[in-house]
From Swiss-Prot:
Modified sites of kind 3-methylthioaspartic acid: 89
UniProt function note: With S4 and S5 plays an important role in translational accuracy.
Protein name as it appears in the record: Small ribosomal subunit protein uS12
Domain of life: Bacteria
Family according to the record: Belongs to the universal ribosomal protein uS12 family.
Gene Ontology CC entries for this record: small ribosomal subunit
Residue span of region Disordered: 1-32, 103-123
Signal peptide segment: none
Annotated Basic residues bias: 108-123
Taxonomic path: Bacteria, Bacillati, Actinomycetota, Actinomycetes, Propionibacteriales
InterPro entries, sorted: NA-bd_OB-fold, Ribosomal_uS12, Ribosomal_uS12_bac
Amino acid sequence: MPTIQQLVRKGRTDKISKNKTPALKGSPQRRGVCTRVYTTTPKKPNSALRKVARVRLSSGIEVTAYIPGVGHNLQEHSMVLVRGGRVKDLPGVRYKIVRGSLDTQGVKGRKQARSRYGAKKEK
């Protein structure tokens, strides 16, 4: 507990919150071009082949972005929209690709949580 004199001299410093998506430069999303599309394995207790893409953003920064949903049509030179949001079991993956915008197709045959995966309503 500081004395009043110490508070007069120094004052209290505000906590600085760390930016979790620095590559987006304050934007909600950023456009980018896929430079590499590949699969990775997750951290220890989990086991799978997670689909990820290396994306060069319009801000000039290259990031690793997760491709959510079952199946995708992405390849090198595909234009994608990238949003923030990390994947807990993939170290270094702090961005996700928005399904159903630009060159990314929505998930086929999706019935629930359709808006998250860019899936149109089935008739």
